[in-house]
């Protein structure tokens, strides 16, 4: 199982750099609800109905995982390590889900490779 960051799902959806890799593992991925909101925000910003986009994500093999209190604590604990890299709350939410599930995090953000975490960053 891999945990998708919003950037990875957007790369897949918009056929950006790295989309072929995401396509090859998409059936073995989950994504946090915070990151789904980021993806839907992109659709909304571009004039598309975010609800329609959500229904397509929901119908895909990707499991949407709710953001929990455990994830909130993990994400907050990552602030000191991630602030200097410019990582957002959404980034930390993805990392928190990845840590809680002990699964690799799949992102298009190269800054994540500088992190020293107990998970693999792809």
Segments predicted by a language model, with ranges:
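Short, well-structured N-terminal submotif of metal-dependent ribonuclease cores
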Residues: 1-31, 43-55
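Alpha-helix capping/helix-boundary segments
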Residues: 8-9, 35, 71, 93-94, ...
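Short loop/helix-cap segments at secondary-structure boundaries that form the rim of catalytic
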Residues: 21-24, 111-118
């Amino acid at each position: 199982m891999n945990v998708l960051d919003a950037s990875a799902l957007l790369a897949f959806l918009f056929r950006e750099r790295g989309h072929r890799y995401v396509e090859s593992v998409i059936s073995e991925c989950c994504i946090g609800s915070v990151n789904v909101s980021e993806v839907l925000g992109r659709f909304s910003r571009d004039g598309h109905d975010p609800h329609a986009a959500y229904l397509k994500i929901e119908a895909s093999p990707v499991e949407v995982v709710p953001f929990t209190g455990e994830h909130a604590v993990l994400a907050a604990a990552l602030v000191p390590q991630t602030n200097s890299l410019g990582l957002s709350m959404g980034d930390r939410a993805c990392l928190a889900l990845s840590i809680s599930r002990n699964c690799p995090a799949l992102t298009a953000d190269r800054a994540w490779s500088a992190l020293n975490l107990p998970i693999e960053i792809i």
